[in-house]
């Protein structure tokens, strides 16, 4: 059975496999350039959870086995995709007539990055050879002349390689990063919903004053976690709601919110027959980026008039708007169901929602209210109407049909 078919029918079993076992289940089990095994393995990496990618990378570094280097190469390139780069996979085995690069990471707003992956720096790295790859790729018009070079190394103790880069003529064109810190960058991106985070990450990967960027990433990672733990959105009282009382401002554990979000997204993906990967804290998409989901979670507030409240941010709006089939998922902490509002419906009704618009931040208010029959609806506060959510409801059963 092809690996992706096995994944769809036996997800839990695949997640228990080591990366060696996963590769052996792909095609004939031997990764070669242009092989079916390579196609299946790379296809699987596109849809597997980020946490599995992290574990696979660490397995390659902690265990000695055949082809660990080329497996790590594919994993590192997938980490690049999780950072929203357009990635061109390189060759497993170099050829005289073909440039033997490991990967090219591209983005619309930043220079290209030529990536070289090394499991260790015990073996001398030829900086001249990497630079030659860059020159040949530019001659073939496959990268821009201002492209930089990034060496991704398995070991964190890379002092000798750092000194080699600093003392070379490539000091301002090349940077180093360990696999573990590349993993941290993906974690930072997936914990954040701030679009500037991705911009900052890309700037870190480009040449600047420091040769190795691990310590800077550590600081950013710690800061991001601290900020996330302090975040608590408090809903404003909507117009016309003041007579129904105020809200008790109790914070909900971020881990509980995250678990509920994943629960809702996975249930919706199953019902739709889709494989979704995390783009950021609340955003998810398919490997081809056409199917997109934004999932917000609300605790249960006191009173029935406005029991749930969500902020809908402009960057979420852009993300969903750029997809072909997009949904805004409204999940409730105390319910085993959620509501998948098609983006077309939300976009049509945004103008009827209250909005906070400040210089530093803006967002629409998505306040849920209770209907006479006990079901929920979005309160279209500006026009005094309600958008019933019952047509968009789905439960946690895998057999449940999504709207």
Residue ranges with predicted function:
Residues 99-106, 278-294:
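Short acidic loop-to-beta-strand element that houses the catalytic metal-binding Asp/Glu
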Residues 175-272, 279, 339, 344-403:
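Non-catalytic C-terminal interaction segments of nucleic acid-processing enzymes
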Residues 1-70, 226-252:
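Interdomain/boundary linker segments immediately adjacent to catalytic/signaling cores
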Residues 146-148, 280-281, 289-291, 314-316, ...:
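Short, surface-exposed beta-edge/turn micro-motifs
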Residues 65-70, 74-225:
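Catalytic core segments in nucleotide and nucleic-acid processing enzymes
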Residues 288, 296-300, 330-337, 371:
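Short, flexible beta-strand-to-coil junctions
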Residues 48-91, 241-289, 299:
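Acidic-basic catalytic patches of nuclease active cores, encompassing PD-(D/E)XK
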Residues 121-132, 159-162, 299-321, 338-341, ...:
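Active-site-adjacent loop/helix micro-motif of nuclease/hydrolase catalytic cores
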């Amino acid at each position: 059975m092809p690996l992706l078919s096995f994944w769809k029918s036996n997800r839990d079993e695949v997640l228990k496999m080591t990366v060696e076992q996963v590769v052996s289940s792909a095609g004939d089990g031997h990764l070669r350039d242009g092989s079916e095994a390579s196609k299946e393995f790379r296809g699987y990496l596109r849809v597997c959870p980020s946490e599995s990618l992290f574990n696979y990378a660490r397995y390659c570094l902690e265990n000695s086995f055949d082809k660990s280097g080329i497996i790590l190469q594919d994993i590192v390139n997938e980490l690049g995709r999780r950072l929203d780069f357009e990635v061109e996979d390189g060759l497993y085995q170099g050829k005289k007539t073909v440039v033997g690069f490991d990967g090219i990471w591209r983005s619309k707003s930043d220079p290209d990055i030529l990536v070289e992956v090394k499991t260790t720096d015990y073996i001398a790295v030829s900086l001249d050879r990497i630079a030659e790859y860059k020159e040949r790729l530019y001659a073939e018009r496959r990268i821009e002349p201002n492209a930089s070079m990034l060496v991704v190394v398995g070991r964190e103790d890379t002092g000798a390689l750092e000194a080699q880069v600093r003392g070379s003529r490539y000091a301002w064109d090349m940077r180093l990063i360990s696999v573990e810190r590349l993993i941290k960058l993906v974690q930072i991106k997936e914990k954040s919903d701030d679009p500037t985070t991705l911009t900052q990450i890309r700037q870190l990967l480009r040449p600047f004053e420091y040769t190795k960027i691990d310590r800077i990433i550590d600081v950013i990672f710690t800061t991001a976690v601290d900020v996330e733990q302090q975040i608590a959105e408090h809903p404003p009282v909507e117009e016309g709601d003041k007579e129904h009382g105020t809200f008790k401002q109790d914070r909900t554990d971020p881990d509980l919110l995250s678990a509920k979000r994943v629960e809702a997204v996975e249930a919706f993906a199953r019902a739709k027959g889709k494989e979704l990967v995390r783009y950021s804290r609340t955003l998810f998409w398919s490997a081809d980026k056409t199917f997109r989901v934004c999932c917000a979670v609300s605790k249960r507030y006191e009173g029935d008039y406005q029991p749930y409240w969500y902020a809908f941010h402009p960057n979420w709006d852009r993300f969903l708007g750029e997809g072909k089939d997009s949904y805004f998922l409204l999940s409730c902490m105390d319910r085993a169901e959620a509501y998948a509002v098609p983006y077309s419906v939300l976009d049509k009704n945004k103008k009827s929602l209250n909005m906070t618009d400040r210089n530093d931040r803006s967002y629409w208010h998505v306040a849920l209210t209770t209907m006479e029959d006990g079901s929920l609806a979005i309160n279209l506060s500006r026009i005094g109407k309600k958008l019933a959510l019952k047509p968009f409801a789905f439960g946690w059963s895998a057999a449940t049909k999504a709207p």
